[in-house]
Amino acid sequence: MTGKEMVNARNKLGFTQRQLGDALGLHWNSIARMERDELPIVKQTELALAYLLLVKKMKGGKR
């Protein structure tokens, strides 16, 4: 997953960087650095983000 893909996923969720960080158990600054490709996005983070997107889709897009 690239930083740009992470930004797109976060935007689909309607989350701020802080909200996504809280949902993933990460600091918002780490999210920002991942989105700028300054930190690698580990598989665990990628899978957790995919899970959040799946849950949103299953709920019909409602949070």
Model-derived regions, located:
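Short, intrinsically disordered, low-complexity terminal segments
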Residues: 6, 29, 45-47
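Recognition helix of helix-turn-helix/homeodomain-like DNA-binding domains
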Residues: 25-40
